[in-house]
Amino acid sequence: MSSTEATVFDVIVIGGGHAGCEAASAAARAGARTALVTHRFDTIGVMSCNPAIGGLGKGHLVREIDALDGLMGRVADEAGIQFRLLNRRKGPAVRGPRTQADRKLYRLAMQKMIAAQDNLFVVEGGAHDLREEHGRITGVVLSDGRTLSCGAVVLTTGTFLNGLIHIGEKKIPAGRMGEKPALGLSERLTSFGFALGRLKTGTPPRLDGRTIDWQSLDMQSADEEPVPFSLMTDRITIPQIDCGITRTTPETHAVIRANLHRSAMYSGSIEGIGPRYCPSVEDKIVKFGDRDGHQIFLEPEGLDDDTVYPNGISTSLPEDVQLDILKTIPGLETAAMLQPGYAIEYDFIDPRELKRSLETRKVTGLFLAGQINGTTGYEEAGAQGLLAGINAARRASGGDPVIIQRTEAYIGVMVDDLTSRGVSEPYRMFTSRAEFRLSLRADNADQRLTPLADKLGILGHARKERFEARETALDEARSLTQSLTITPNLASRYDLRLNQDGVRRSAYDLLSYPEIDLDRLKSIWPELGAVDPATREALEIEAQYAVYMDRQKSDIAVMEREEQLLIPAGLDIDGISGLSNELKHKLKQRRPETIAEAQRVDGMTPAALALLIAQIKKFGYRQRAASELSEGQGAA
């Protein structure tokens, strides 16, 4: 919906970036009267850094957002101009859907969805302060003096919280280039007792594509058959483009080394820690100086935009040095720089200050999502925003929080990592972070999470119908393949080599064999040809993983039993004999809610965990004894 003069809401979301859009949409879908506070409507959904969505691990998050009826997957499908399925030759569990996006199309598609959402009102203005009474959030004060009342706030400030841009020795207070930072909120968060830290991220210079020598470059094409992110997308209709590939050279490295003292990163100007997996070009040269070159992907920012994003040369060097660097890179020797690269520092809060609902422990009704929690990336932000929005709506209405377990989704893995371990650098999602990644595949996100969205009341009617139709088709195909059987002797007539043990095997069993798919089995059972392509792919993947999934289910059951063992809020940590003072301090500081969370506290040992479990059991005995005594006295 458009802007409103109303001042009373159930939920207020501060920030119109990727976390804020998902939070506002989710809260509104959950039935909360929601305000999205942002400086300007036309900056909603802006891609501040790279023009891409998805990738390894990140693509899983986008699919999970979509499965919960979030926005990012559908928006990316409307704006994607180079779809590629990463790790296509590897197993389905580690494949990563990705697309480059047209910045303008992405922004406009997101704004369209925000404007169309019932219960959602956009309030243009800056958030200056938070209102709190007796440890509970009550509202937001805008920079123009207006006060908005609410039952919960979701803070999604991105890089705007005390944001400071660095270009060489130049320092510019900003949330991103050309936009003012959020200053008052940091002071209020400090007054609440939160300890703020500083993190850093960076972006490369933007180039004029008309001045790049594309003919001298290797080119990378999109997939011939683009794989959409969203269940709601039938096919990709946006024209697909190529990207250029080039590399830094020894001359590039020489220019950088000669000017390291002028880099904000290496001159001591920047206090914040940057993302390890997205290093600046200065970092690459210093840490990997033995390499003769580093790859650069030249990514056009839009179908009708000449701006090019050179992915791989993020930098905080001065503008003149950036120009000298470009002259040493093949294909970029005469490239014009439209905007210099820069580093940006911003405040964040230790995510161990959060519950797994993403509500802060110190202030009831205050939720945090995105880079303020120490993460990096649009996808990580969007996933947190969606969960925070759901729980903010439930907090405002008096409902119980929704906790997504790490056994259920990459969202659960990320939130559990953040709230139990904290961050020492910007957190990025990888498939390797998930213990149960065979179960948490991108292709089965809908099966894992859409029933939850339905239960929570945030699932749209059209998606529910499509999901149920897909599940029905899969159930029917599974039943069909399980009903069709063949002996090893007969299978040999169709060039299927099976163990000659006389055991009949079903078509479903055969799909778990290497190089056997439904196309091959159609020669035996022609009726399999009626299975549609989407169902066929889902069935083949399911059958391939069936044996491994059964094993993983038992492992998940063990972890879930641990998750269910709650640590009572009144447990006397200091009274645990044999537990080190250091661990007592950490447990009191972080206040884990379950044994599984306590297990991930730094320094926790099996022996210490056993002491904690014993104390919980003693606490339970005392509670039961006190209850029985009270009941006995009442009866007397």
UniProtKB/Swiss-Prot annotation:
Pfam families: GIDA (PF01134), GIDA_C_1st (PF21680), SAM_GIDA_C (PF13932). GO terms for cellular component: cytosol. Its main location: cytoplasm. It is found in: Cytoplasm. Keywords: Cytoplasm, FAD, Flavoprotein, NAD, tRNA processing. GO terms for biological process: tRNA methylation; tRNA wobble uridine modification. One of its GO terms (molecular function) is flavin adenine dinucleotide binding. FAD binds at residues 15-20. Its cofactor is FAD. InterPro entries: FAD/NAD-bd_sf, GIDA_C_N, MnmG, MnmG-rel, MnmG-rel_CS, MnmG_C, MnmG_C_subdom, MnmG_C_subdom_sf. The keyword Chaperone does not apply. NAD(+) binds at residues 274-288. NAD-binding protein involved in the addition of a carboxymethylaminomethyl (cmnm) group at the wobble position (U34) of certain tRNAs, forming tRNA-cmnm(5)s(2)U34. HAMAP family: MnmG_GidA (MF_00129). Homodimer. Heterotetramer of two MnmE and two MnmG subunits. Belongs to the MnmG family. PANTHER family: GLUCOSE INHIBITED DIVISION PROTEIN A, PROTEIN MTO1 HOMOLOG, MITOCHONDRIAL. This is tRNA uridine 5-carboxymethylaminomethyl modification enzyme MnmG. It comes from Brucella anthropi (strain ATCC 49188 / DSM 6882 / CCUG 24695 / JCM 21032 / LMG 3331 / NBRC 15819 / NCTC 12168 / Alc 37) (Ochrobactrum anthropi).
